[in-house]
A protein has these predicted regions:
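Domain-level signature for soluble enzymes in the chorismate/prephenate branch of the shikimate pathway
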Residues: 2, 10-14, 18-327
């Protein structure tokens, strides 16, 4: 048994090494009509964004609201020629707008430099099988502490924000507001709105800088995150597979951990380079997980996708390119 486990570990380690090296030697592959090339029936695509992503004319975009969230900033940066943005209270509601046809796209947080994967939003993506990842936008995150007019740091007894905002500002708060309690909110902008409505000098919010002006709050401290390199990745979702030739694919797998080595070996063999892997318990039994797997290739074909989705319990969830907003 010990030798068998050692052998599996060796195979997995070798596969990871091959995956990391494959970016320098991936084969050229044909474009895929199934995965990353234009789908039949899409005739209303007219606007091309800076990422090469083609956007439906008069597109509507749902996002985690209210106004003033980082998700709104990401959505407006990605969809620079779109005017119809729909703020929703939760990510589930934002995705539901796309599924119901009320929105063409949804933008949801995916991963942060400091807070890691945004697990509840990844869970929402795992649950919904009717949407695909068609784009990604990365923006810098500069968390700001804000309170009502006249408030000072000495007044603050409670700091509210989204869970990610609380995590990203924890070190700063430990040093500057060590006795202040935490209050988790649905979003950073919801926290700013809550503080504004409370008119309470003892409550502050950690939110995007623009939220202070939007909700009439006073900036108490800037850049309260741990590092200036703080970034968040956001997925762009649609009911239709990406009509452009993305170089990154995402798969969602439901399996036990000991099946991962086979999947990773097949990724490398198909010409992919493993980029990220997030795991979430599937709620059925110990040791059984849902995995969100991202992999890159110079181009992506039907055969490459099929090589991965031949495994039971693994599905293709889209391909995309990304754009990044500079600080």
């Amino acid at each position: 048994m010990r030798n068998n486990r050692s052998g599996k570990a060796l195979v997995l380690a070798l596969a990871l090494c091959i995956s990391l090296l494959s970016g320098c030697s991936q084969p050229q592959t044909k474009e895929s009509s199934e995965s990353c090339t234009p789908q039949s029936g899409i005739s209303d695509i007219s606007t091309t964004e800076s990422s090469g992503f083609e956007v439906k004319e008069n597109a509507s975009v749902s996002f985690l609201g209210p106004e003033g969230t980082y998700t709104e900033e990401a959505a407006k940066f990605f969809f620079q020629n779109t005017q119809n943005f729909i703020p929703k209270k939760t990510v589930d509601e934002a995705i539901s707008e796309v599924i119901s046809g009320n929105a063409d796209y949804a933008v949801i947080p995916q991963e942060n430099t400091l807070g890691g994967a945004v697990t509840n939003y990844i869970d929402a993506l795992i649950r919904e099988t009717e949407v695909y990842v068609v784009g990604e936008v990365i923006i810098p995150i500069n968390q700001t502490l804000m309170g009502v007019e006249g408030a000072t740091l000495d007044d603050i007894k409670t700091v509210c924000s989204h869970a990610q905002g609380l995590t990203q500002s924890k070190a700063w708060r430990s040093e500057n507001l060590p006795d202040a309690a935490e209050k988790e909110m649905d979003s950073t902008a919801a926290a700013a709105s809550f503080v504004a409505e409370s008119k309470d000098k003892s409550i502050a919010a950690v939110a995007a800088p623009g939220a202070a002006e939007l909700y009439g709050l006073t900036v108490l401290a800037e850049n309260v995150q741990i590092t200036d390199t703080n970034r968040t990745r956001f997925y762009v979702l649609s009911k239709t597979k990406n009509p452009s030739s993305g170089k990154r694919a995402v798969f969602i797998a439901n399996c036990e951990a000991n099946r991962l080595d086979d999947i990773i070996i097949d990724l490398s063999g198909a010409g992919f380079e493993l980029v990220t892997l997030h795991d979430r318990p599937d709620g059925t039994k110990l040791g059984s997980y849902n995995y969100v797997i991202e992999a890159e290739a110079k181009s992506i074909s039907d055969d490459m996708i099929s090589e991965i989705t031949k495994h039971d319990g693994i599905r293709f969830a889209g391909c995309f390119d990304n754009i990044e907003k500079q600080p």
